[in-house]
C-alpha cells in the first residue's frame, strides 16, 4: 500500500511539472506583439519647432492640424482617430497588445513625442495613420512612407520599416480596392526619424479627391482601411519568421 501511495505521489509530481512546462511553453509562444498606433495630427497645431531627428539642426513644426475633406469637411485628425480606434479593436481581437499615442483629438503631442511613446513601449511595429491632399483633385490612391536606407538617424531599422510599409500598403489596397501608389522613402518625417522601432506612415487616400473623400467619411470604408492595415501587420510578422 505504501509503495502504491509513493508511486501515486511521484506520478502526481510529474504531471504537475509537465503541466507547468506546458504552461510556460504556451506563454512564450503566445507572447503578444506590441503595436503602437499614432492617429496623425490633432485639433490644434503646435507650430513650435523641434529637430527632425536626434541631434539634427534642421527643424520642423512639432505637429500640424492636417488637411480636411473638400466635400465632406471631415478633418484629417478626426478621420485618423476613427480609423485608429477601429484598428485598435481589430488588433486586440487578433491577440496583439496595442498602445495608442492618443485617444482624443484635443491633445498636444509632438511628432517626436509620439515616436517616444512607441520607443518606450518597445513596440514591434509603429503605425502612423494619415490622409493625403494634393493640388489636383484627380490624384487618388493609398501610399505608405518609411525612411531611406541611408537615414542618418535610424538606418538600422530601414529594412523592417520598408517591409512593414510594403505589407501594410498591400493589405490596405487589397481590402479597400483603392488605387495602389507606392512606398515613399524619405528622411524628412520627424515621427519616423525619432523612431527606434519599425515604423510606417499610412496615407489612406486623398481628401482632395471627391471619391476618396466621400469614401473615407463612411464607417464601412474606414473599417476596410483598418482591416487592411491589420492584415498587413499580420503578413509583416509572418514574413519575419521565414
Descriptions of predicted regions:
Residues 1-242:
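Catalytic-site microenvironment of enzymes
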